A protein has these predicted regions:
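Small-residue packing motifs within transmembrane alpha-helices
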Residues: 18-20, 43, 49-50, 203, ...
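C-terminal ends of transmembrane alpha-helices
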Residues: 30, 34, 183-196, 240-254
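Non-cytosolic membrane-interface motifs at loop->transmembrane helix junctions
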Residues: 39-43, 196-204, 253-260
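Alpha-helical transmembrane segments and their membrane-interface exit regions
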Residues: 48-56, 206-216, 263-267
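Juxtamembrane membrane-interface segments at transmembrane alpha-helix termini
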Residues: 56-66, 189-193, 215-223, 243-248
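Hydrophobic alpha-helical segments of polytopic membrane proteins
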Residues: 166-179, 213-241
Length: 268
């Protein structure tokens, strides 16, 4: 970023971030198309969105109770309400989708996709309550991609609260180191199959790690143009190519292989 962008970074869009997100959106489409490079794309594409969000975090949101409250209200309106509304629509239309064949309750016709059957009023209400409290996992099939909105909302709110508390202490850096370590431990445990009862919250830890990496890039004014130069891109491509032959990552399922693997893939 040039000097003008650094000076006004809080008041203007960051071109590099927009470009990076645009590229990752394209890669996301390619990855979901059954491309030969899907495993390579999955190593980093979702983590990058959380890194970008962390990079755009503004400390002013955590400077007072009023600012924290305003920030939470903003995220409720922009993330939580849309998430609940979209999922609610698909929940209420569940039986209609089964009837017209968009959803299938016949294994021979499912094509390997999750079977979904008709649900009654009670189950509809249960699923709606689960959605409201983020306890439904990715049950609502057509709204499955909204796991990202749910996860981003939780990470944003969690970080704002933690940042506010950290500002009130004298050992701020120590707190952030502990938070990072705790997230690494929890993300690793979730990846190993623990804490499945967390449902919609189990993606939080891996996502928060990527979010914190974005904050560090912003804090130390890492020049994105230099980091993602032709040479940097070459190194990242090779590292990720090697990693893709070993394993892949799925943040939506909390699968990160191991923490070192995940952090390196995210940074690359």
């Amino acid at each position: 970023m040039d000097k003008v962008q650094k000076t006004n970074i809080n008041n203007m869009r960051i071109t590099e971030i927009d470009v990076i997100k645009g590229i990752c959106i394209i890669l996301m489409v390619v990855g979901h198309s059954g491309s030969p490079i899907t495993k390579w794309i999955y190593l980093f594409h979702m983590a990058v969105f959380f890194v970008a969000s962390g990079f755009c975090w503004n400390e002013i949101h955590a400077t007072s109770i009023l600012n924290v409250g305003n920030y939470i209200k903003k995220k409720i309106c922009s993330l939580y309400i849309p998430y609940v509304m979209v999922n609610a629509v698909y929940i209420f239309l569940n039986n209609f989708f089964v009837k017209i064949g968009i959803y299938s309750n016949v294994s021979e016709l499912s094509g390997g996709i999750q079977l979904i059957d008709y649900i009654g009023v009670k189950d509809t209400m249960v699923e709606l309550i689960k959605t409201i409290f983020f306890l439904s996992g990715n049950h609502v099939q057509l709204a499955g991609a909204f796991w990202f909105i749910r996860c981003l909302f939780v990470v944003n709110i969690l970080h704002c609260i933690v940042a506010f508390i950290a500002k009130k202490t004298k050992r701020r850096n120590t707190i952030w180191v502990l938070i990072f370590i705790i997230n690494c431990i929890l993300a690793s445990l979730v990846s190993e199959g623990y804490f499945q009862f967390l449902r919609g919250f189990k993606t939080t830890f891996a996502a928060y790690i990527a979010y914190m990496i974005g904050i560090l890039l912003r804090k130390y004014e890492i020049n994105l143009k230099k980091v993602y130069s032709i040479y940097g891109f070459g190194v990242s491509f090779i590292v990720l190519l090697i990693f893709s032959s070993i394993a892949t990552i799925s943040i939506s399922e909390g699968k990160i292989v191991n923490i070192v693997f995940y952090v390196i893939a995210t940074v690359c």
